Amino acid sequence: MAQLSLQHIQKIYDNQVHVVKDFNLEIADKEFIVFVGPSGCGKSTTLRMIAGLEEISGGDLLIDGKRMNDVPAKARNIAMVFQNYALYPHMTVYDNMAFGLKMQKIAREVIDERVNWAAQILGLREYLKRKPGALSGGQRQRVALGRAIVREAGVFLMDEPLSNLDAKLRVQMRAEISKLHQKLNTTMIYVTHDQTEAMTMATRIVIMKDGIVQQVGAPKTVYNQPANMFVAGFIGSPAMNFIRGTIDGDKFVTETLKLTIPEEKLAVLKTQESLHKPIVMGIRPEDIHPDAQEENNISAKISVAELTGAEFMLYTTVGGHELVVRAGALNDYHAGENITIHFDMTKCHFFDAETEIAIC
């Protein structure tokens, strides 16, 4: 169990590339924190600084109140799971899981107890005598997790552990890691570029871009209240739709659209002096409905209709704007078809067109 405090953490390489910029985060005991962002955003570098595998260029890392900047990795009471399983091919599953404990000269009976306990949790009991080559990708990843679990560390770090698995296995392992967190009741920090993993697993998500933290919050918070256009577009699949326009009276207008803004949102826009200035409206695909209501109805033409099973993803053209609409599968939709869509303006978001920061 551990609490972490990252205070003004910086990472600058010798070539003056600034990879992580003024990273601040307080992590409570037993939290499941996910760092998410595109490639090169600094998420893995931050994780490696926590692990002691990268030197911290500036700021302080505290674990349970103790400054860890100069403490070697092996003394930080941290266990790490990497993207590649890093298993010894000539060793059995048991020996792979026990290897670190043997290096620490832990008593044989303690090693046996921990390995069997971890194997029971991970469903590996029947595979303990097998070698990695005889296992599936998901089973090998469980072995890598087991090797970390047996250390009984205060903090578990995971660097894109599921990226080598196929889609079905990723879904399965997501659930298994979440269950594992509940069973171990320990602090976990997980790195991924996959926003679905972040949304489904985290107690809090840290969204990064270009080495800078964009937003920290619970999955529902960052989805429903994104801090800026980057977060709004990165979290959610398909991504949020964005339309540039202006506010005229109680309407959001473009050259081809005119949508009525709810009073509560209009009041915020007025206090932020956003009237008659360039502004961006964002609306998620599930908040555009392929049916007519009393107002905010627009004619759209379907360019692509993707059936995913329970629903359609409709890629439409609306007055010169490309918009994605999520629709139920009760009706059939086809490319080239004209439909009427309704904007649920109570669910829309408005962003400053210049700063891209959320207004409401």
Swiss-Prot record:
Q: Name one Pfam family in it.
A: ABC_tran
Organism field: Escherichia coli O6:K15:H31 (strain 536 / UPEC)
Q: What is this protein called?
A: Uncharacterized ABC transporter ATP-binding protein YcjV
Does the record's keyword annotation contain Transport?
yes
Q: Which PANTHER family match?
A: MALTODEXTRIN IMPORT ATP-BINDING PROTEIN MSMX (PTHR43875), OSMOPROTECTIVE COMPOUNDS UPTAKE ATP-BINDING PROTEIN GGTA (PTHR43875:SF1)
Q: Which SMART domains match?
A: AAA (SM00382)
**What GO cellular component term, any one, is given?**
ATP-binding cassette (ABC) transporter complex, substrate-binding subunit-containing
| GO MF annotations in UniProt | ABC-type transporter activity; ATP binding; ATP hydrolysis activity
